[in-house]
């Protein structure tokens, strides 16, 4: 797996999912050259979606993409049985792969993680993207565990690494041939320079073309050209994480008149000071 895969937001309208807005956002990304989308992930506010909404969003994403780009469906859970059910649903409706976050809150051991992902891998045939984000889950998927899973299961092909420690990421890349996608926009270029393959991105929701260009340059070894875009994007990327994701990206999309709508509690509107910083970054980039 290689390239740019925006983690799409879930637009809301009148308390429900705005499916027309969702389609509009996906088509915008397809038209701007992304390699695929990630549906109902962290950026899509998956924790506050009902199971029915979760499934309908995946179905809509598959329908809109229609084979033009890949759909990576969020299917993770801190319950192995629930993750299996969500993964099987995603496969049944035509998703190209599933994104599986490490179980959160219950803090499994590395052996528990091996057994969790093994059970899911044995239950489906489509590719699996492991998702390591210790800042949210309180558990780190160790390089040795990733290596074991990659070598044991042919459908575990990729890991989204949102651990910002480049030493950890280097160990992962050096341990096996699993595809590594950065889970941090700001670290995309460094991760590719270490041997990574791309990114699951937040900023690409609003500047997909530029981000795709940067990643393409990097994957072609044109790091001078990639660096120029990286630094052009840098302040904008940082501004999208001054509060919890997806609060800033949805705020930015609303400011840019893109379908986004409200946030679902417990997420709420940005503090005015931070919103001003975000608006400034959007203006400096030329989006406002």
Swiss-Prot record:
Q: What gene name is listed for this protein?
A: dapA
Q: Which GO terms describe its biological process?
A: diaminopimelate biosynthetic process; lysine biosynthetic process via diaminopimelate
Instruction: Quote the record's binding site residues for pyruvate.
Output: 43, 200
Q: How far does the signal peptide extend, from start to end residue?
A: none
Give the annotated active site: 131 (proton donor/acceptor), 160 (schiff-base intermediate with substrate)
The subcellular location is: Cytoplasm
What is the organism of origin for this protein?
Methanococcus aeolicus (strain ATCC BAA-1280 / DSM 17508 / OCM 812 / Nankai-3)
Report the top EC class in one word.
Answer: lyase
Q: Pathway of this protein? A: Amino-acid biosynthesis; L-lysine biosynthesis via DAP pathway; (S)-tetrahydrodipicolinate from L-aspartate: step 3/4
**Database matches in InterPro entries:** Aldolase_TIM, DapA, DapA-like, Schiff_base-form_aldolases_CS
E.C. number, please? 4.3.3.7
Catalytic activity, as annotated: L-aspartate 4-semialdehyde + pyruvate = (2S,4S)-4-hydroxy-2,3,4,5-tetrahydrodipicolinate + H2O + H(+)
What is this protein identified as? 4-hydroxy-tetrahydrodipicolinate synthase
Query: What GO cellular-component annotations does this UniProt entry give?
Result: cytoplasm
User: Residue numbers for the site described as Part of a proton relay during catalysis?
Assistant: 42, 105
